[in-house]
Amino acid sequence: MGALISIYAVCEYPDVFGGAGCVSTHWPVGEGYVLQYLQHHIPAPGEHKFYFDYGTETVDSLYETFQLKADVILREAGYTESVDWLTIKIEGHEHSERAWRERVHIPLEFLIGQY
């Protein structure tokens, strides 16, 4: 649920949070309510960054449909892919600390480093 609270933090406090690293975002909570929330509360593009990823195994395999909808919301809000937001599908990864540990460098580089 860390990804969902990170989205909320950027949307509610855009002057405090400049980005969110959303790893294995559990979009299905509330039957996609978070997508509706994002659509109505996303901050203006250009000053904020969002990173999303999801695997293809275990519960992560349920996220792609939701993530594609989130990508449309970001694009329609004026966010530029690979600049303001990045979404990565990671084959063979599951919803686990081991999988996240293997890829934690990707959101860190995108959000605070040179991607």
Predicted segments — roles?
Residues 1-115:
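Non-catalytic cap/lid and distal C-terminal segments of serine-dependent acyl enzymes
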